[in-house]
């Protein structure tokens, strides 16, 4: 009896050991998922989201480790590093980063900022996290990110994230500090040249490393999902690259910014609105950023349109890179925040998603999406018949031998009395930026003036020899760039479009503007539709 039981017990014991072994391998992932379910930060209404928030791309959590999904059987590998005060690298307990599947890792509220991106199986990711001790840096060594069966790759040499004063550049975008002294990166999406591809390329470090993630194009029926803006501008490296190529998209993007009335945590408190306004109402349109209080938040946009360079889409909103919100104020320099894309957008100002883009070797060129109808715009010409369409200012910045052609093949004429479209003389319409590399090479879309007979055509300030903008490589200003908020002062002079009309046409994302009257000049009433 005993001799016949021994083999059976041995077989049972073998199966039992195998079951225990399988359970031991599967338990960590299951436990991670279960803990993520028990304390789900995605249901927290106060949660600060990012373009690649795991609540949008997958499942994340705010505990000591991130959830794991997917499989590494396809040959993908992930190298992660974590530090809590310096540059020490290595994986700490439970600091795994989701790989292969759809899960990402982003953990506000813990003092850490996981910068990781999810892509299809077979691609390799690298994530790094570190505490936001100013002046310190956390780096991650790239243990070669191998992959098989995937078109996305990551060049895994050593890179580091520098935490400095109030903001830092992460490739094409900038990082924004959260209220818990951690940083989150909002990266500028750049589209590969193929218009049929929906793969997004995000710059991760200034050395040119990138992580590719497959994101579907924006769709109005998926309002809370990260997406690419469709074919936009392809570039890598610094925020304003050395050259651009437009692979599609001509429709306008409407961006409406709401200035919150109250001050934000970590920012010097001030009056409800920097320039007046009634209690309980949104602040009137803003014209500058030299205020030490308040915040600006994008509250409108269109997923039917393509994103402009420097903007990203998340949670039903279009965010300009480098912007801050009331819930996510800029720390370190509350007086004058740092912006990656110039000054903030004034309320009710509209922009063209198809800007005229310089093509030159210098990386110092910048694109300024100038709000229409704002200061610095001067009219030129007396309205006599002459050239139609945009004109370029006659200045030393535009050599006489420059070849500037419109989409119809006609050259852009210098701004003057013979032009039917107004212009901005040299030295006006420029913007200041925190980056010294963006001090020259500005191209600014300006509105049509009072003497314009071809309303809606913006003027441009040119500082490069060759301009590209349309899908065919020719300049193609968007007529809607000449629109401004309606008011009695603009009747018969400058074309205007009410915010209500704009938002009704573009199917806005995010909350509707409940009180469009605040965007009109003080004392004017909105005409009933």
UniProtKB/Swiss-Prot annotation:
Main subcellular localisation: secreted
Glycosylation-annotated residues: 172
Location in or out of the cell: Secreted
Region (Disordered): 38-248, 383-492
GO terms under cellular component: cell-cell junction; cornified envelope; desmosome; extracellular region; plasma membrane
Record key words, sorted: Glycoprotein, Hypotrichosis, Secreted, Signal
Keyword Coiled coil in record: no
Top-rank taxon, per record: Eukaryota
Example GO biological process: corneocyte desquamation
Signal peptide start and end residues: 1-32
PANTHER family per record: CORNEODESMOSIN (PTHR23207:SF2)
Disorder noted: Hypotrichosis 2: A condition characterized by the presence of less than the normal amount of hair. Affected individuals have normal hair in early childhood but experience progressive hair loss limited to the scalp beginning in the middle of the first decade and almost complete baldness by the third decade. Body hair, beard, eyebrows, axillary hair, teeth, and nails develop normally. HYPT2 inheritance is autosomal dominant. Peeling skin syndrome 1: A genodermatosis characterized by generalized, continuous shedding of the outer layers of the epidermis. Two main PSS subtypes have been suggested. Patients with non-inflammatory PSS (type A) manifest white scaling, with painless and easy removal of the skin, irritation when in contact with water, dust and sand, and no history of erythema, pruritis or atopy. Inflammatory PSS (type B) is associated with generalized erythema, pruritus and atopy.
Biological role: Important for the epidermal barrier integrity.
Protein name per UniProt: Corneodesmosin
Organism: Homo sapiens
């Amino acid at each position: 009896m005993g001799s016949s039981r021994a083999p059976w017990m041995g077989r049972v014991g073998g199966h039992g050991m195998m079951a225990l072994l399988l359970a031991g391998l599967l338990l960590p992932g299951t436990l991670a998922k279960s803990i993520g379910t028990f304390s789900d930060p995605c249901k927290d209404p106060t949660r600060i989201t990012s373009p690649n928030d795991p609540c949008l791309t997958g499942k994340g959590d705010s505990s000591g480790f991130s959830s794991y999904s997917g499989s590494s059987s396809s040959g993908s590998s992930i190298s992660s590093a974590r530090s809590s005060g310096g540059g020490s690298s290595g994986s700490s307990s439970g600091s795994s980063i989701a790989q292969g599947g759809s899960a990402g890792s982003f953990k506000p509220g813990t003092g850490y900022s996981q910068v990781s991106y999810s892509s299809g199986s077979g691609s390799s990711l690298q994530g790094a996290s570190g505490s936001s001790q100013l002046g310190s840096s956390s780096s991650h060594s790239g243990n070669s990110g191998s992959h098989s069966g995937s078109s996305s790759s990551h060049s895994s040499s050593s890179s580091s994230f520098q935490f400095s004063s109030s903001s830092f550049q992460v490739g094409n975008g900038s990082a924004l500090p959260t209220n818990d002294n951690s940083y989150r990166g909002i990266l500028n999406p750049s589209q590969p040249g193929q218009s049929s591809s929906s793969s997004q390329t995000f710059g991760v470090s200034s050395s040119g490393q990138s992580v590719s993630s497959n994101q579907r194009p924006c769709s109005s029926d998926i309002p809370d999902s990260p997406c690419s803006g469709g074919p936009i501008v392809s570039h890598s490296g610094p925020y304003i690259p050395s050259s651009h190529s437009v692979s599609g998209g001509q429709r306008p993007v409407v961006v409406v910014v709401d200035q919150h009335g109250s001050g934000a945590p970590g920012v010097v408190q001030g009056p409800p609105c920097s320039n007046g306004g009634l209690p309980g109402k949104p602040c009137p349109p803003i014209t500058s950023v030299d205020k030490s209080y308040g915040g600006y938040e994008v509250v409108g946009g269109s997923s039917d349109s393509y994103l402009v360079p420097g903007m990203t889409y998340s949670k039903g909103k279009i965010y300009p890179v480098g912007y801050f919100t009331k819930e996510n104020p800029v720390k370190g320099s509350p007086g004058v925040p740092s912006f990656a894309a110039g000054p903030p957008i004034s309320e009710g100002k509209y922009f063209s998603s198809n800007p005229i883009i310089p093509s030159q070797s210098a990386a110092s060129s910048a694109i300024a999406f100038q709000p229409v109808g704002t200061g610095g715009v001067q009219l030129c010409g007396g309205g006599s018949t002459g050239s139609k369409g945009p004109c370029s200012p006659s200045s030393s910045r535009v050599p006489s031998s420059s070849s500037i052609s419109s989409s119809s093949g006609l050259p852009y004429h210098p701004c003057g009395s013979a032009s039917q479209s107004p212009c901005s003389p040299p030295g006006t319409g420029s913007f200041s930026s925190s980056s010294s590399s963006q001090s020259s090479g500005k191209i600014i879309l300006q509105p049509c003036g009072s003497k314009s007979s071809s309303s809606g055509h913006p003027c441009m300030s040119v500082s490069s020899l060759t301009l590209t903008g349309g899908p065919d490589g020719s300049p193609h200003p968007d007529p809607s760039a000449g629109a401004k908020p309606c008011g009695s002062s603009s009747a018969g002079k400058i074309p205007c479009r009410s915010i209500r009309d704009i938002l009704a046409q573009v199917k806005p994302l995010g909350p509707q503007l409940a009180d469009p009257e605040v965007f009109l000049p003080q004392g004017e009433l909105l005409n009933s539709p």
